[in-house]
């Protein structure tokens, strides 16, 4: 955090520096503030936090530092000092409070979101009520609407497809290169080649064939002799034929992949196919044909010996090849109908195996004649008699097609009734018995269109038994198929039924059918089962739909309501419930849109699920023994059921239909039959044997009564939800719009509040430190762990000249003694803010002690500061109470306490405006705490001096790191790292022009002025006071020195009286002594510092000294001064130049009268040979001239 507001105070002293100018400098980095900035500031464009923001920030900043060739040293925080721990405890409390507030805000946000969703739902319902309903409007698909994707294609992506295609092309290219290099390298007879996919083999063989055509001469030389040319041609022809055979074999293999399953299915059904060929139709893009050769079917005996599932699969398929006129009309109107699947075509071929073309023509003529004469009747003649007999034999063996009927089918009595839906596989015959509102029973046999035509042909021969004119055209017409043509005599079928006691029940949901009339209800019919199933009493009935009926929607599920076939039935017997029927209103129901089958009749088809889930029939039975037999009871009146029918000639488009009963009705009619759903989502009805029926039924009834209480709670919740929905019905659209807009505004405000609270609650953990250190090691950058404060460690590195400055935004570093700081290094601006201690000390008059005093007033990590005190007020306080160290704060605290003791006394009129304002401040007890200043002045740091080493970034490990923490791929990581590595590898660097002289712009920036007038006034007054204080100190020091000198002069004044004669004698004796010493030596001249001078010069000098001393004595006696000062006690000897042999000497001697000591004599001389050299040069010049 640093000192609050200190950067604002120092910004006038900072200047902008280009990052390029910092190239090669060693800078310390306080990483702790980076981590805090990343946690609190790094957000996505929606304001939400991202994953690993500290590592992402560190990565980008490292790249920038290294790009400018700066050598950083990262410093991590150590243990916090005691004073800082107290501040951190308070911060932690604020963070915990923000975290709890964030959770509350999240709950409010969720509630607001739910309210908005409820408003949208109600708003949509209101708007839908206002607009006309478009549910019954039939919309045809647009011409350019694509078919829905398969599940595999939905989960696949373009990238995966592209990768697969790329791998395939790489393999192909490798093979082509190897083949082009050496055509004999590829052995098409090898196992490796045969293990390749057929498509790849086909491409390779095709390339080889083309290669042999065009480039054969490159590898096989032409024969030189003409006789061998024919052999050359034959060899090429044989090789070409050899390749063609392999290509045909591969094509057959590819064809087998697409059409081979037809052969397998047909063989599973008991048939035999000699050959199946499938090819694409050239004239159409999406069509293909299947040619089946050598079809042989099983005999009837073989069919009887086969098991039920296989026979039902074979004979339950469609047999009609030629469609009716109505179907032809439909195909003309719908050209986009789905073509028949291979399985359907296979069934057609099997059905028409024994039919002749003449019989087909006759049946076609009879069917067209009947279609023109009696449109309500059923068409006949679409299948030959031989085909019909085959159908009869097949239906004899079908165990799942089993319809119980009696003489009282048309009665529709009030007893228990039974509805059975028979189905074995996707194309098996299925039946649904329906009764309209008048109680007339209708039975619908649900099958494909070709089977309908077959059954209509049989039913037309039995019109006498059950007339079809009894039902009007608007309702469903009944066509009864004679049971003599479909005998069911196999007793093994009934025995197989005995083992199927647990039957799957159907969940029936109430839904309105817009296509049905209001008075019509779909209810089960009421056939009565006899003790034995007779051949002559079995009826198959076909449900036909008229032109007036609209297409329906069918909702289907995997569960169907069923009962057991073992018990024998007798009419007019009471029914009891043996198994509960649970209802699940929230079960997933799939709606399948469909189209009308044709304009005359629509056939509803039921589709079973992939030969696994057989659709059990819904059957009502009456019991003859009320004591031991328990049956399923179905109500007579059931709500209308939505039915949607779709005809598609392919067997994969059959529609499954689920009949649904409303929850409330079944709860009312069967209060004891509710049961929770099973794990499979289906409901199992447990059938009972005759001896065990009473005991097990009683236990089931007890369990159901206990579960009723549990099911009551969800019903109450549903009722409350319905009541809450009814409350919205009286609200108009304008109120809903207003409420929704208010909720939207509240939601946005809660989002912003939550984001702010998350920023406050974010904290730096030790794991973040470890991850950051790992990234630094990968970049090869040194880092150190500070003993306590990272800012103090950076400052000591700067003070000991181990670094050239510090990159940080924490202003605490100035208080620890830093001299150079770079701020806002990673802003988008082109320049970095550079601060020096010398600059703001000269401009603002702030030193380290004053900065610590500002921390007391403004607040920092070690102290809270004084409330409502900013940087300007703090500078005014320091101006009002000057002093050194803590003296200003002690004065301020003393003055404030005095002012608070007598608040009612009239303030001093001499007080300034600042002091009047300072009276309202609130100081904490113990202000100022000297421990704060001690912590700043004497921090715990590591002052050892060592060398730092920088390594080269490890590219591979950095890529792996970015993949693990950021999810980046190799390309994105390289985009950031390659410019950095390129810049680091540069060997030569060039100096910038601003390194030679200062720019004019920089000089203008250095001359920034303080914008605040109050601050400018306070700084000016403070600087003036400092100058005045410095001047007064200097003046006091000078006065003190003068007094000391006067005392010294008085003490030394008595010893300064000396005789003039003594002085003259001393000087003359000194000169004589020097002359006597020099006479004993043979001298011939000298330089500075030598004592050997000429005699003439010595004599002249002595005479000059004596004359000068005599003149001085005469002047002093003439002046008659009674006292001599220390300054006048020195005797000066004037220099007198003496010419002797062209050499001049000058000397000065000073004597100190106070101490009576001799001073060193300074002698300056020229070379004695100076004039002689000049004369010699002149003589030489004359000689040359002569």
Swiss-Prot record:
Residues 1124-1133 have a biased composition (Polar residues). Induction: Induced by replication stress caused by DNA double-strand breaks (DBS). Mg(2+) 2 binds at residues 810, 812, 861. The modification Phosphoserine is found at residues 384, 705. One of its GO terms (molecular function) is enzyme activator activity. Changing residue 978 to A: Reduced protein stability, two-fold decrease in 15-nt bubble DNA incision activity and smaller decrease in Y DNA incision activity. Residues 1169-1186 have a biased composition (Basic residues). Changing residue 72 to H: In XP-G; combined with features of Cockayne syndrome. A motif (Nuclear localization signal 1) lies at residues 1057-1074. GO terms for biological process: base-excision repair, AP site formation; double-strand break repair via homologous recombination; negative regulation of apoptotic process; nucleotide-excision repair; response to UV; response to UV-C; transcription-coupled nucleotide-excision repair. CDD domains: H3TH_XPG, PIN_XPG_RAD2. One of its GO terms (cellular component) is nucleotide-excision repair complex. InterPro entries: 5-3_exonuclease_C_sf, HhH2, PIN-like_dom_sf, XPG-I_dom, XPG/Rad2, XPG/Rad2_eukaryotes, XPG_CS, XPG_DNA_repair_N. Residues 306-342, 354-385, 404-473, 510-533, 667-724, 1056-1081, 1095-1186 are annotated as: Disordered. Its cofactor is Mg(2+). A motif (Nuclear localization signal 2) lies at residues 1169-1186. Its main location: nucleus. Pfam families: XPG_I, XPG_N. Belongs to the XPG/RAD2 endonuclease family. XPG subfamily. It is linked to Xeroderma pigmentosum complementation group G: An autosomal recessive pigmentary skin disorder characterized by solar hypersensitivity of the skin, high predisposition for developing cancers on areas exposed to sunlight and, in some cases, neurological abnormalities. The skin develops marked freckling and other pigmentation abnormalities. Some XP-G patients present features of Cockayne syndrome, cachectic dwarfism, pigmentary retinopathy, ataxia, decreased nerve conduction velocities. The phenotype combining xeroderma pigmentosum and Cockayne syndrome traits is referred to as XP-CS complex. Cerebro-oculo-facio-skeletal syndrome 3: A disorder of prenatal onset characterized by microcephaly, congenital cataracts, facial dysmorphism, neurogenic arthrogryposis, growth failure and severe psychomotor retardation. COFS is considered to be part of the nucleotide-excision repair disorders spectrum that include also xeroderma pigmentosum, trichothiodystrophy and Cockayne syndrome. This is DNA excision repair protein ERCC-5.
């Amino acid at each position: 955090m640093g000192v609050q507001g200190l950067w604002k105070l120092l910004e006038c002293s900072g200047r902008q520096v280009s990052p390029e100018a910092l190239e090669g400098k060693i800078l310390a980095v306080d990483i702790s503030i980076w981590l805090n900035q990343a946690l609190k500031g790094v957000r996505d464009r929606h304001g939400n936090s991202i994953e690993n923001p500290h590592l992402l920030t560190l990565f980008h900043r490292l790249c920038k530092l290294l790009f400018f060739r700066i050598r950083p040293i990262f410093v991590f925080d150590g243990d916090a000092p005691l004073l800082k721990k107290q501040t951190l405890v308070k911060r932690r409390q604020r963070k915990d409070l923000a975290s709890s507030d964030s959770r509350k805000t999240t709950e409010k946000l969720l509630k607001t979101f739910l309210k908005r969703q409820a408003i949208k739902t109600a708003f949509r319902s209101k708007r839908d009520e206002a607009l006309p309903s478009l549910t019954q409007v039939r919309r045809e698909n647009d011409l350019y609407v694509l078919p829905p994707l398969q599940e595999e294609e939905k989960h696949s992506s373009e990238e995966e497809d592209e990768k697969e295609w790329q791998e395939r092309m790489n393999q192909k290219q490798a093979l082509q290169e190897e083949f082009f290099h050496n055509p004999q390298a590829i052995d098409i007879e090898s196992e490796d080649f045969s293990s390749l996919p057929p498509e790849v083999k086909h491409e390779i063989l095709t390339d080889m064939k083309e290669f042999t055509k065009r480039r054969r001469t490159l590898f096989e030389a032409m024969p030189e002799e003409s006789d061998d040319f024919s052999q050359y041609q034959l060899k090429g022809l044989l090789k070409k034929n050899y390749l063609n055979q392999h290509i045909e074999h591969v094509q057959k293999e590819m064809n087998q992949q697409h059409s081979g399953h037809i052969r397998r299915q047909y063989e599973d059904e008991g048939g035999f196919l000699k050959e199946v060929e499938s090819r694409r139709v050239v004239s159409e893009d999406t069509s293909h044909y299947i040619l089946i050769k050598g079809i042989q079917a099983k005999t009837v005996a073989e069919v009887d010996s086969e098991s039920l599932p296989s026979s039902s699969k074979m004979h339950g398929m469609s047999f009609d090849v030629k469609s009716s006129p109505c179907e032809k009309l439909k195909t003309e109107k719908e050209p986009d109908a789905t073509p028949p699947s291979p399985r359907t075509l296979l069934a057609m071929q099997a059905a028409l195996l024994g039919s002749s073309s003449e019989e087909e023509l006759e049946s076609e003529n009879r069917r067209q004649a009947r279609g023109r004469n009696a449109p309500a009747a059923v068409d006949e003649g679409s299948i030959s008699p031989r085909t019909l007999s085959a159908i009869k034999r097949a239906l004899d063996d079908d165990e799942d097609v089993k319809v119980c009927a009696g003489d009282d089918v048309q009665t529709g009595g009030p007893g228990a009734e039974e509805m059975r839906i028979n189905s074995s596989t996707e194309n098996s015959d299925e039946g649904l018995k329906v009764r309209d509102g008048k109680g007339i029973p209708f039975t619908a046999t649900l099958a494909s269109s070709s089977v309908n035509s077959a059954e209509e042909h049989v039913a037309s021969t039995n019109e006498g038994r059950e007339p079809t004119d009894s039902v009007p055209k608007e309702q469903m017409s009944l066509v009864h198929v004679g049971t003599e043509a479909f005998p069911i005599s196999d007793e093994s079928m009934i025995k197989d039924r005995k083992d199927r006691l647990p039957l799957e029940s159907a969940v029936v949901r109430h839904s309105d059918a817009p296509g049905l009339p209001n008075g019509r209800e779909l209810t089960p019919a009421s056939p009565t089962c006899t003790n034995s199933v007779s051949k002559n009493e079995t009826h198959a009935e076909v449900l036909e739909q008229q032109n007036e009926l609209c297409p329906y929607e069918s909702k289907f599920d995997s569960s169907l309501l069923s009962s057991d076939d073992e018990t024998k039935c007798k009419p007019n017997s009471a029914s009891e419930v043996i198994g509960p029927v649970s209802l699940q209103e929230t079960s997933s129901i799939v709606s399948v849109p469909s189209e009308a089958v044709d304009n005359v009749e629509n056939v509803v088809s039921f589709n079973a699920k992939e030969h696994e889930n057989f659709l059990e029939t819904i059957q009502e039975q009456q019991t003859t023994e009320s004591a031991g037999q328990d049956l399923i009871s179905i109500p007579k009146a059931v709500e209308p059921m939505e039915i949607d029918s779709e005809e598609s000639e392919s067997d994969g488009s059959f529609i499954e239909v689920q009949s649904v009963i409303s929850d409330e009705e079944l709860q009312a009619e069967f209060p004891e039959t509710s049961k929770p759903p099973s794990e499979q989502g289906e409901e199992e009805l447990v059938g009972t044997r005759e001896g065990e029926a009473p005991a097990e039924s009683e236990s089931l009834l007890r369990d159901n009564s206990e579960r009723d209480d549990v099911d009551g709670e969800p019903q109450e919740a549903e009722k409350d939800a319905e009541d809450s929905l009814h409350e919205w019905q009286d609200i108009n659209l304008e109120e809903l719009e207003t409420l929704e807009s208010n909720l939207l505004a509240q939601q946005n405000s809660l989002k912003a509040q939550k984001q702010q609270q998350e920023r406050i609650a974010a904290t730096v953990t030790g794991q973040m430190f470890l991850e950051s250190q790992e990234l630094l090691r990968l970049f090869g950058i040194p880092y150190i762990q500070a003993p306590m404060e990272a800012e103090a460690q950076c400052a000591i590195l700067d003070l000991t000249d181990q670094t050239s400055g510090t990159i940080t935004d924490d202003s605490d570093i100035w208080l620890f003694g830093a001299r150079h700081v770079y701020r806002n290094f990673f802003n988008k601006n082109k320049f970095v803010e550079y601060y020096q201690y010398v600059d703001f000390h000269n401009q603002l008059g702030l030193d380290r002690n004053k900065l610590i005093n500002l921390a007391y007033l403004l607040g920092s990590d070690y102290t809270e500061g004084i409330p409502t005190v900013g940087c300007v007020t703090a500078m005014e306080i320091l101006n009002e109470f000057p002093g050194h160290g803590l003296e200003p704060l002690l004065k301020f605290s003393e003055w404030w306490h005095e002012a608070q003791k007598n608040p009612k006394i009239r303030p001093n009129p001499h007080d300034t405006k600042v002091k009047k304002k300072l009276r309202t401040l609130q100081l904490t007890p113990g202000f100022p705490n000297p421990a704060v200043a001690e912590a700043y002045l004497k921090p715990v740091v590591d002052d050892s001096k060592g060398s730092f080493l920088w390594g080269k970034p490890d590219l591979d490990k950095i890529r792996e790191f970015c993949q693990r923490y950021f999810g980046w791929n190799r390309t994105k990581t390289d985009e950031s790292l390659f410019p950095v590595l390129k810049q680091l590898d540069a060997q030569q660097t060039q100096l910038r022009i601003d390194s030679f002289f200062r720019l004019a712009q920089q000089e203008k920036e250095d001359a920034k002025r303080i914008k605040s007038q109050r601050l400018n006034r306070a700084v000016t007054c403070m600087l003036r006071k400092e100058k005045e204080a410095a001047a007064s100190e200097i003046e006091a020091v000078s006065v003190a020195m003068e007094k000391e000198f006067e005392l010294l002069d008085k003490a030394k004044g008595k010893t300064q009286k000396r005789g003039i004669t003594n002085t003259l004698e001393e000087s003359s004796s000194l000169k004589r002594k020097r002359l006597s010493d020099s006479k004993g030596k043979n001298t011939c001249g000298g330089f500075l510092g030598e004592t050997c001078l000429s005699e003439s010069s010595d004599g002249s000098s002595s005479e000059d000294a004596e004359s000068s001393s005599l003149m001085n004595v005469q002047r002093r006696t003439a002046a008659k001064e009674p006292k001599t000062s220390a300054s006048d006690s020195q005797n000066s000897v004037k220099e007198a130049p003496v010419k002797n042999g062209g050499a001049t000497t000058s000397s000065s001697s000073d004597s100190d009268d106070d101490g009576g000591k001799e001073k060193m004599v300074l002698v300056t001389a020229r070379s004695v040979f100076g004039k002689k050299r000049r004369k010699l040069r002149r003589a030489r010049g004359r000689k040359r001239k002569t």
